[in-house]
């Protein structure tokens, strides 16, 4: 769906942003009937509260939106967006100041609150529209919202309609829209050149493939690698029913990478962008890889399979090996890789790893600037021994259960040896409960933080 601002020439209703306790000073200059109405409503400016103000003729002439205390505003994401679903249909504009709130964040949150996933049923109207607040770069915020909407659509679509073939089609549509090139590697070539991607996906009726999209002719090179496991049964180490229900989101890394690519291409920075998506389904059949198998990767490293449900790092490893061969200025991988990451930081925060402090600092600062919370975890070298089994170079599922997100990241780092700057995001990709700007369902994580970091990381 299109998430855009209302046009400037459309009639609109003013919104007055009111801090908790600030309604009296605002109302002091208003007519008696307005002050009386606000009193009767009991509106004091609490977060997300709304008061519609009638004129003397009874028609709505303004809206008051509460954003809480300074402390509440400091810890809230998309504070203004909390009011969006509560307002009547129509177009609104912000009158006056935003009480210290960041205009870009509030404008984006409003657009994201209008997102609806309507592929399988008629959905309610996206509701109240907004003109961009003063100082907001309309084109940039709309580009970011469009990328996030794409990510959400891809994750929310069930695997029956978003398998490897459909993910390839979606990637092709994106490439055509922005004049990018895209190649799909499958069949015998995939088995020969990307053996671990092939091994993970060979049991499924929808053939595994590696998608390779390129955009931009000059500038620094950025390669994004997104995990595209379109459904994950766990393989022969089959998941319990409780663990399988949300596995349509196991391609959330690919969805996030493609959504970020959309943002980048729409904003047209001077860089060379490459997006690699290993697209597979981890299914069960007589062709499934087995616990105890040893696979040889594209890089030549051998991997002992101690759990077929740790398949994401296998497909990512072959794609990362390809990315590393080109030695771009920056490689970033995004994957719904481990449950351990959720245990560590919960569902809202995207943990990431970085090979250089400057990369970590830029991503951390970028996330803070755009309300996309991230948290650095360490590439802790002493844990390398945990991913080294007795009969192969690497173990895809170390026993013991300790430091699961770190050992998975260390596994991936083994395949990035020529590129000095590498960052890996271990995302969740799902909003369990609706929040301002974040309807329940698929959600992008880390993409906006990385986009905000690119000027520091690549000078674009």
Task: Briefly describe each language-model feature range.
Residues 1-228:
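Short amphipathic alpha-helical segment within the helicase RecA-like ATPase core
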């Amino acid at each position: 769906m299109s998430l855009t601002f209302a046009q400037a020439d459309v009639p609109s209703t003013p919104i007055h942003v009111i801090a908790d306790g600030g309604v009296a000073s605002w109302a002091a200059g208003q007519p008696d009937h307005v002050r009386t109405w606000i009193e009767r409503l009991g509106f004091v400016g609490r977060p997300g509260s709304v008061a519609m103000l009638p004129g003397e003729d009874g028609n709505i002439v303004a809206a008051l939106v509460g954003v809480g205390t300074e402390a509440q505003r400091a810890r809230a994401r998309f504070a203004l967006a909390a009011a969006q679903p509560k307002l009547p249909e129509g177009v609104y504009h912000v009158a006056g100041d935003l009480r210290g709130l960041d205009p870009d964040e509030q404008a984006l949150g409003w657009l994201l609150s209008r997102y609806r996933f309507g592929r399988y049923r008629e959905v309610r109207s996206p509701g109240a529209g907004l003109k961009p607040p003063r100082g907001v770069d309309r084109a940039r915020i709309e580009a970011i919202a469009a990328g996030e909407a794409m990510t959400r659509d891809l994750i929310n679509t069930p695997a029956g309609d978003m398998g490897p073939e459909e993910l390839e089609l979606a990637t092709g549509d994106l490439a055509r829209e922005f004049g990018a090139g895209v190649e799909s590697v499958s069949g015998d070539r995939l088995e020969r050149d990307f053996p671990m991607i092939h091994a993970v996906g060979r049991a499924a009726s929808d053939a595994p493939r590696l998608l390779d999209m390129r955009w931009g002719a000059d500038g620094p090179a950025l390669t994004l690698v997104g995990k595209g496991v379109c459904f994950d049964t766990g393989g022969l180490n089959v998941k319990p029913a409780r663990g399988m229900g949300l596995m349509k989101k196991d391609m959330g890394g690919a969805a996030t990478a493609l959504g970020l690519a959309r943002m980048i291409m729409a904003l047209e920075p001077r860089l060379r962008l490459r997006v690699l998506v290993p697209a597979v389904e981890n299914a069960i059949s007589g062709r499934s890889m087995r616990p105890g198998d040893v696979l040889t990767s594209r890089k030549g490293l051998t991997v002992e399979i101690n759990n077929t449900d740790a398949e994401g790092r296998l497909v990512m490893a072959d794609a990362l090996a390809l990315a590393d061969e080109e030695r771009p200025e920056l490689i970033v991988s995004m994957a719904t890789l481990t449950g351990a990451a959720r245990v560590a930081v919960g569902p809202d925060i995207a943990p990431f790893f970085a090979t250089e402090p400057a990369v970590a600092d830029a991503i951390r600062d970028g996330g803070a600037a755009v309300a996309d919370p991230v948290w650095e975890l360490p590439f802790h070298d002493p844990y390398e021994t945990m991913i080294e089994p007795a009969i192969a170079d690497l173990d895809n599922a170390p026993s013991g259960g300790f430091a699961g997100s770190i050992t998975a990241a260390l596994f991936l780092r083994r395949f990035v040896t020529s590129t000095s700057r590498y960052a890996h995001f271990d995302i969740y990709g799902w909003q369990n409960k609706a929040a301002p700007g974040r309807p329940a369902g698929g959600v992008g994580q880390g993409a906006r933080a990385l986009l905000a970091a690119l000027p520091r990381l690549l000078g674009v």
